[in-house]
């Protein structure tokens, strides 16, 4: 009984794969998934994983992988189609009958798939030593040539004769996307004089071909036209091999070309796929996200690659959230993924993966790097572009995080640099305390001391968000802040256990400094016997605001000969107001007055 492919998707959505697997395998819950002993090979330690969210199983031992239908097929020995029917019967799901039009459609699809399989067998027989030598020069081994069924379409009439002998006419070859028609009406083999690379769908069926011209002809690369079985917006080259690897690694690598995919697979990066001569689509992204939470784009670093990155960013922004992510590998100038792995090796490419940047970082790189922001108009345009990106994000929490990230980047790369330049030009030296830190760095120490001595203060969301998003001048303190929040505070580590944990890290010296009974940063007493956290926080927050206000005041005074006196007066008024408020707090709380 023939069923539509849409019915397979219905089964995947309606039936939890863990329910089916549990009938054959004892499963244990682990990190949101399930693990158990693989039913397809002998093992003593569980390496078989099942994910309901990804609707997928994978064995790290024997590499068995697939969906709920594939699992049933592997267990029962039935075909994929027969397994789908069995599952529908077992779970009481109605099997929709095909209409006459659907039957005609699937009969035509089957015929096209058969023709494409025959074409690939023919192309494989046409490989010559010259072609193999060309492939070897590109770093492709004979084993890889076989694995990817790479072939060759000759110029002569062997192709036409091959199908004529099998009683397959021109009309059928046209429906399969194998022939073209010249302006003079002449019919020809579409892939004539090209290396052929079969394109397979998720079910490992050949649905089309890619062709690379032998020599310098144009176009260099050619894809099959869209047919009944081949839609470029749905298909990714290499997906039949990559999906199981993407599930295992929880990410996929999206590149531009066939040979990029082939080179990466040969080097061990079997999670690589490529879009087929077209822009990345929503369907592509959703297909990859079903297999792994992160899609790593690795596009050429030229102008075309940057434009492709921008298109993909704009497409992805409404779709991403804290779980479904996009990141980018930035290739060295002049390299594509094929070159990167063949010329520099797998270890080099693995390091590029490790150094990948987030989508937000890529946006900042595109909008900021190599550009001038000397004028108000240039800065305003930067802010507008960044806000436009943020506005496309549907996830409200992520949108807020992006706004904060870009605000921090603007502060670090524009405001802070301008402040430093102004300070240098006006001979204004930073205020240094007896501890050897600037006033701002002492405040940073004080904020970190709060984490260590009074973590209860973080129960106030505004305070936690402020400390979490604070951009430290002292990067060692910033690293300590991030580590302490993630590893100690968020894990609710008992106070008696903290020292033993920190002692094993590189942060121990900082921790000891911050843990002193009477911390002397800014001459503030952190002694718990007389502490008032509300007043302490007010003092620190106002002091931080005052220092930044004074720096902005200095910029205004020194940035031009013609001062904006109204603005200067406003700064003076605000500085005096905050200084007076701090004085009141000093008298109420601080042991040693600061002036």
From Swiss-Prot:
Instruction: Please give the GO cellular component terms listed in this UniProt entry.
Output: cytoplasm; DNA-directed RNA polymerase complex; primosome complex
User: Domain comment text?
Assistant: Contains an N-terminal zinc-binding domain, a central core domain that contains the primase activity, and a C-terminal DnaB-binding domain.
One GO molecular function term?
zinc ion binding
Q: What is any one GO biological process for this UniProt entry?
A: DNA replication, synthesis of primer
Q: What is its EC number?
A: 2.7.7.101
Q: Is the GTP-binding keyword given for this protein?
A: no
InterPro entries for the chain? DNA_primase_core_N_sf (IPR037068), DNA_primase_DnaG (IPR006295), DNA_primase_Znf_CHC2 (IPR036977), DnaG_bac (IPR030846), DNAG_N (IPR013264), DnaG_primase (IPR050219), TOPRIM_DnaG_bac (IPR034151), TOPRIM_dom (IPR006171)
Which PANTHER family does the protein's record reference?
Answer: DNA PRIMASE (PTHR30313:SF2)
Q: What is the lineage of its organism?
A: Bacteria, Pseudomonadati, Pseudomonadota, Alphaproteobacteria, Rickettsiales
Protein name according to UniProt: DNA primase
Quote the cofactor binding remark.
Answer: Binds 1 zinc ion per monomer.
User: Record keywords: Endoplasmic reticulum included?
Assistant: no
The prosthetic group or cofactor this protein requires is: Zn(2+); Mg(2+)
Zn finger intervals (CHC2-type) = 38-62
Matching CDD domains: TOPRIM_DnaG_primases
| Binding locations of Mg(2+) 1 | 256, 300
Keyword tags: DNA replication, DNA-binding, DNA-directed RNA polymerase, Magnesium, Metal-binding, Nucleotidyltransferase, Primosome, Transcription, Transferase, Zinc, Zinc-finger
Catalysed reaction(s) here are:
ssDNA + n NTP = ssDNA/pppN(pN)n-1 hybrid + (n-1) diphosphate
Domain Toprim, first and last residues per copy = 250-332
Give binding positions for Mg(2+) 2.
300, 302
Per UniProt, what is one Pfam family of this protein? Toprim_2
Q: Which domain of life is it from?
A: Bacteria
Summarize subunit and interaction data from the UniProt record for this chain: Monomer. Interacts with DnaB.
What job does this protein perform?
A: RNA polymerase that catalyzes the synthesis of short RNA molecules used as primers for DNA polymerase during DNA replication.
Q: Which family does it belong to?
A: Belongs to the DnaG primase family.
């Amino acid at each position: 009984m023939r069923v539509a492919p849409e019915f397979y998707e219905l089964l995947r959505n309606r039936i939890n794969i863990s329910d089916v697997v549990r009938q054959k395998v004892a499963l244990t819950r682990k990190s949101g998934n399930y693990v158990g002993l693989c039913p397809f090979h002998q093992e003593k330690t569980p390496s078989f994983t099942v994910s309901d969210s990804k609707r997928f199983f994978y064995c790290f031992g024997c590499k068995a992988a697939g969906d709920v239908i594939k699992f049933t097929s592997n267990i029962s020995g039935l075909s994929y189609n027969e397994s789908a029917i069995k599952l529908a019967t077992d779970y009481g799901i109605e099997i929709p009958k095909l209409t006459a039009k659907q039957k005609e459609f699937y009969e035509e699809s089957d015929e096209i798939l058969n023709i494409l399989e025959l074409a690939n067998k023919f192309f494989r027989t046409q490989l010559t030593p010259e072609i193999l030598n060309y492939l070897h020069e590109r770093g492709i081994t004979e084993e890889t040539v076989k694995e990817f069924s790479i072939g060759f379409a000759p110029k002569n009439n062997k192709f036409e004769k091959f199908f004529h002998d099998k009683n397959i006419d021109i009309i059928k070859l046209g429906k399969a996307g194998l022939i073209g028609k010249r302006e003079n009406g002449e019919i020809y083999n579409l892939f004539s004089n090209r290396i052929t690379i079969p394109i397979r769908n998720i079910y490992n069926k050949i649905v089309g071909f890619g062709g690379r011209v032998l020599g310098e002809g144009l176009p260099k690369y050619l894809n099959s036209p869209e047919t009944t079985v081949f839609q470029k917006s749905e298909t990714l080259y290499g997906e039949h091999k990559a999906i199981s690897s993407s599930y295992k690694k929880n990410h996929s690598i999206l590149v531009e070309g066939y040979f990029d995919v082939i080179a990466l697979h040969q080097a061990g990066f079997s999670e690589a796929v490529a879009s087929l001569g077209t822009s990345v689509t929503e369907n592509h992204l959703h297909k990859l996200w079903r297999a792994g939470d992160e899609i790593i784009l690795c596009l050429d670093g030229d102008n075309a690659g940057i434009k492709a990155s921008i298109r993909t960013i704009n497409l992805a922004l409404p779709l991403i959230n804290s779980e479904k992510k996009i990141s980018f590998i930035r290739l060295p100038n002049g390299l594509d993924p094929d070159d990167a792995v063949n010329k520099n090796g797998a270890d080099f490419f693995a390091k590029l993966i490790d150094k990948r940047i987030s989508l937000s970082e890529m946006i900042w790189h595109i909008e900021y790097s190599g550009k001038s922001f000397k004028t108000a108009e240039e800065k305003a345009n930067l802010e507008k572009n960044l806000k436009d990106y943020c506005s496309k994000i549907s996830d409200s929490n992520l949108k807020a995080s992006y706004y904060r990230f870009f605000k921090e980047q603007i502060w670090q790369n524009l405001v802070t640099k301008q402040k430093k330049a102004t300070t240098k030009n006006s001979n204004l030296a930073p205020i240094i305390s007896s501890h050897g830190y600037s006033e701002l760095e002492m405040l940073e120490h004080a904020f970190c001391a709060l984490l260590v001595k009074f973590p209860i203060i973080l129960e106030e969301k505004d305070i936690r968000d402020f400390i979490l998003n604070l951009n430290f001048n002292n990067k060692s303190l910033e690293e300590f802040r991030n580590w302490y929040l993630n590893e100690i505070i968020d894990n609710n580590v008992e106070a008696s256990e903290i020292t033993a944990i920190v002692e094993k890290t590189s942060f121990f010296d900082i921790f000891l400094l911050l843990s002193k009974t009477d911390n002397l940063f800014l001459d503030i007493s952190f002694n718990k016997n007389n502490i008032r956290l509300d007043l302490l926080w007010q003092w620190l927050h106002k002091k931080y605001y005052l220092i930044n206000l004074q720096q902005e005041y200095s910029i205004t005074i020194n940035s031009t000969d013609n001062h904006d006196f109204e603005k200067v007066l406003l700064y003076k008024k605000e500085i005096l107001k905050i200084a007076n408020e701090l004085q009141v707090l000093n008298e109420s709380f601080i042991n040693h007055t600061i002036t």
